[in-house]
Regions:
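H/E-rich (His + Asp/Glu) clusters that bind or coordinate divalent metals
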Residues: 128-137, 143-150
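C-terminal helical cap(s) of enzyme catalytic domains, especially alpha/beta-barrels
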Residues: 157-175
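Conserved residues at the C-terminal ends of beta-strands
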Residues: 23, 114, 151
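A short, acidic, flexible beta-alpha connecting loop/helix-capping segment that sits on the rim
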Residues: 149-158
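Active-site acidic/histidine proton-transfer and metal-coordination neighborhood
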Residues: 1-83, 159
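Short acidic/polar active-site loop segments enriched in Thr and Asp
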Residues: 17-19, 109, 146
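Short, acidic/polar
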Residues: 1-12, 68, 93-102, 133-136
Length: 175
């Protein structure tokens, strides 16, 4: 985005993309975070002008302090962009997704849905770990969720993982 943001936004808009998502940005120092916020704000404005949404996808690092500040909190307070909240990484980072929804209603139209083991070291199929999905999905309207994406980073058996996740979510959402 720093180098070719306008080109990316135009290509996304021309291709009919509804959301452009930034998957990561430098956050090693506070200066990195501030520079990232500037780029994210410019990208958000360009996306609005192009008629598409813009969101930021988190990992757990955004919830760790950088020089006394939490990058994710800075993103929420210093930008107007929307968020693609990775619910497992937020949980690993010590943030309660439902509390984020309450504090920033409507800012989370996109979710990444996966699960974590008790030690928060291994990704699991949805429903087999510690992420409180029933509670989180009950707060979907507060979050502004429009789409969610089930993922599992590097599963041993992708078909078994997605089948388990689908079964859990189907049962939970139909209850």
């Amino acid at each position: 985005l720093r180098d070719n943001m306008k080109e990316l936004v135009n290509e996304a808009a021309d291709g009919g993309v509804k959301f452009l998502v930034c998957a990561s940005t430098p956050i090693t120092t506070l200066d990195d975070v501030k520079a990232s916020i500037e780029v994210l704000n410019k990208t958000d404005e360009a996306c609005k002008k192009a008629g598409i949404g813009f969101a930021y996808h988190n990992h757990d690092a955004e919830f760790r302090a950088v020089e006394g500040q939490i990058p994710y909190e800075m993103f929420l307070s210093q930008t107007k962009m929307q968020m693609e909240l990775d619910l497992a990484w937020a949980t690993k980072g010590g943030k309660d997704p439902v509390e984020l929804f309450k504090q920033h209603p409507g800012r989370f139209p996109l979710w990444h849905v996966k699960d974590l083991d008790k030690e928060m070291k291994n990704v699991l199929p949805v429903g087999e770990g510690i992420v409180e999905y029933k509670r989180i999905f009950d707060a979907a309207s507060t979050s502004g969720m429009k789409h969610f994406f089930v993922e599992h980073d590097m599963p041993k058996d992708p078909w078994a993982s997605i089948t388990t996740s689908y079964g859990y979510l189907s049962k939970m959402l139909s209850a």
